[in-house]
């Protein structure tokens, strides 16, 4: 269960002139089916992640807006960098390392992989994605929420509510024996039902296009991203899989919204590790 990635070892052996052969699936199924001790560690990691998420979202929503729309806390500018530092310090005190939270405001959030930089602003969606690792157990948490300071624009609220509905629809079908693709298809169904698109934009796509551009989720354990994927061709889920379910919608014109929870697969359903509300205003 503690098998780490073998690529660094493979590289070192090859550099030493040793020929290496191994199956890329080595240890994958053993890693996927989490034991009760592993589930406890993951629940604890997610609990800490939720606490720091609550702190971050409340800090955003209770900040002061300057005349230019930028946010400040106690006279200091609130930026992606300063909020990221606060999150890092909070997690260090709790015994967690943090590779760098995503804090993407406004149009930056239209790129689901953008870490974010610069000032945070009022009346704009701010995607906050935190994925720390426990220094004692080495298991990861992973949670995303979206916060909006001040008045919430109608189009942002509609998009976020759709992402949340898609998340819970996906969770409802998540159980052992169902494929990761089937879970993703349920997410897509809800996204389309509410008038949004899915898939990467084309060369002629308008800036107003609002779509989900990534899979529904991924496995979590000793690494924050590990098998299985909840996406096209996603494999059959097994008892003990721990997954993120994280629908999002992204629009170049105004940014993005995303909500992410962590679940453990059971025989007939899944267990959610999350208690945080799904709200834009904290």
Regions found by a protein language model. Give the residues of each.
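Active-site neighborhoods and metal-handling regions in enzymes and metal-associated proteins
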Residues: 1-282
């Amino acid at each position: 269960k503690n098998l780490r990635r073998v690529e660094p070892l493979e590289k070192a052996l090859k550099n030493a002139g040793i020929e290496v052969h191994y199956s890329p699936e080595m240890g994958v199924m053993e890693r996927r089916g989490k034991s009760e001790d592993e589930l406890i560690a993951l629940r604890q990691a997610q609990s800490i992640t939720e606490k720091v998420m609550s702190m971050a979202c409340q800090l955003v929503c209770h900040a002061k807006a300057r005349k230019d729309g930028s946010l400040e806390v106690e006279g200091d500018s609130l930026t992606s960098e300063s909020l990221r530092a606060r999150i890092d310090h909070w997690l260090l005190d709790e015994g967690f390392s943090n590779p760098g939270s995503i804090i993407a405001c406004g149009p930056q959030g239209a790129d689901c992989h953008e870490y974010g930089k610069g000032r945070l602003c009022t009346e704009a969606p701010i995607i906050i994605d935190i994925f720390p690792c426990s220094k004692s157990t080495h298991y990861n948490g992973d949670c995303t929420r979206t916060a909006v300071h001040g008045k919430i624009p109608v189009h942002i609220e509609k998009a976020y509510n759709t992402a949340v509905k898609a998340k819970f629809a996906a969770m409802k079908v998540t159980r052992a024996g169902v494929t990761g693709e089937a879970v993703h298809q349920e997410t897509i169904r809800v996204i389309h039902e509410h008038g949004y698109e899915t898939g990467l934009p084309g060369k002629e796509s308008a800036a107003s296009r609002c779509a989900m551009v990534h899979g529904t989720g991924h496995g979590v354990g000793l690494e924050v991203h590990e098998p299985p994927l909840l996406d096209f061709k996603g494999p059959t889920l097994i008892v003990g899989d721990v997954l993120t379910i994280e629908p999002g919608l992204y629009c170049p014109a105004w940014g993005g919204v995303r909500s992410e929870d962590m679940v453990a697969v059971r025989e007939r359903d899944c267990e959610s590790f999350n208690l945080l509300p799904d709200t834009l205003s904290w």
